Curated annotation (Swiss-Prot):
UniProt protein name: T-complex protein 1 subunit alpha
SUBUNIT field: Heterooligomeric complex of about 850 to 900 kDa that forms two stacked rings, 12 to 16 nm in diameter.
Xref: NCBIfam families: chap_CCT_alpha, thermosome_alpha, thermosome_beta
Purpose: Molecular chaperone; assists the folding of proteins upon ATP hydrolysis. Known to play a role, in vitro, in the folding of actin and tubulin.
GO cellular component: cytoplasm
MF GO annotations: ATP binding; ATP hydrolysis activity; ATP-dependent protein folding chaperone; unfolded protein binding
Family statement: Belongs to the TCP-1 chaperonin family.
Matching PROSITE patterns: TCP1_1 (PS00750), TCP1_2 (PS00751), TCP1_3 (PS00995)
InterPro entries reported for this sequence: Chap_CCT_alpha, Chaperone_TCP-1, Chaperonin_TCP-1_CS, Cpn60/GroEL/TCP-1, GroEL-like_apical_dom_sf, GROEL-like_equatorial_sf, TCP-1-like_intermed_sf, TCP-1_chaperonin
Main location class: cytoplasm
Amino acid sequence: MLTLGGERTSGESVRKQNVLAACSFANFVKTSLGPVGLDKMLVDDVGDVTITNDGATILKLLDVEHPAAKILVQLAQLQDEEVGDGTTSVVILAAALLKNADELISRFVHPTTVINGYRLACREACKYIQEHMAYDVNKLGKAGLINVARTAMSSKLINLDADMFSQMAVDALMAVEVSGGPKGPVYPIKAVNILKAHGRSMSESMLIDGYALNCTAASQQMPRIIKKAKIAFLDFSLQKVKMKLGVQVVVKDPAQLEAIRQREADITKERIQKILNAGANVILTTGGIDDLCMKYFVEVNAMAVRRCKKVDLKNMAKATGGQLIVSLADMEGDEVFDPTKLGNAEEVSQERICDDELIILRGPKVHPSASIILRGANDFYVDEMERSLHDALLVVKRVLESKRIVPGAGACETAVSIYLENYALTLSSREQLAIAEFARAMLSIPKQLAVNAGVDSTELVARLRSCHNSSQSKPDQAHNKWWGLDLNNQYVADCKEIGVFEPLVSKIKSLKFATEAAITILRIDDLIKLKEEKQPDHDGDECGY
């Protein structure tokens, strides 16, 4: 016990606790790995239900207390943000590395030796993947990109219509391509807006050219199409100005009340006029628009849209070269509207898409935009569809920007495992043991893929190892490096033929993130947990009554 009133755990005990927590976490998500993985139903404290098999979403919704387990949660979230795919794999790999390291340390191998061996193994694994497993996606053309997207959504709900959604993800990102970047074209994910609409089947989801807003014009009398639109993005309400609460006005003549009301209306009209005089013919605001303001817009044939989402206005402002304005007041307190803050687009129109009226912005000045309308039976369905499609968009973005892909279906992990086993034998130091355990941990991914498919994992992984061993030892069989698990036919197959590809950056980052997380936890030899401070009781007054 510490003098601070906390608890201290050190040595082997804390290491065992951390490894157990990590393995327990991995056991929870491992059944959701792969194209035939299962979903999880999570119910929060207020009864909201989430059904998903996305590793990052599952771990984010869990109430985690153990500090080592929190590291794995952050690991999955980092992988989700950086790549979009591989969140479950990275947690399973980190847990396997920890479990194998714990076995080594139990056999009196020093943790520092294990850590050095893991770092060396990770470096060699990344080098091998980049030099021997990577493939230029341009050689496969658009079909290669579609296969990458299909692989990313193979374990998701939208796999039922994978052909349509993979094509949609690729078309959406290619539609928002922005050339002229320092490293070539860039593909901003935020330029693709995803809208959800209940009803119909998911096969009726569609891709729209332009940025779609789930809003309508404030009045039926406003035009439905504005050509050569100049757009004002406002983060405040356009309503009649009223004096704030607490302001008292003393009048001697009741007729002066009408003058006050008239001045309030004039202030509102002046604000509207400043916006219109700047050239704006489309006004989008996050707040409300009252009838008085609406009247002024209708008179000049302008379109006004209220209650827009702030994030949508930010994205649209970026695409059109405009700026989101939070107030008309300048630094000196005067109300002005700068015309340079207007966005420009070829057309803004209100159209009926599916069962809803939407505002669609086409031909923005700075960079193009696209929107995807998702249809589904209920909230759970469309929410999971959105998560799945977002992951697929991120994966395709990474491939488009890096141009490099690797075979999926456990091919990379098995090839690296065989390579590291042989590499470990070339070392005469104790790190050889750690590298061999790292190689064994790599097989946790193909084994789990086979287990989730309900097939004999031992036989299938042994056959896959045989293929990759021959590819590395026999030059005439080098093409075997493309072989992975074909879980639909319960056999091994050429990933090029079955179209299973993943981004190179996904594999590299998964390896690095999992290794660093395992090393971070292995370096811990002391856990000091302080007790919560009791809050003073303030039920009574200062005298204690």
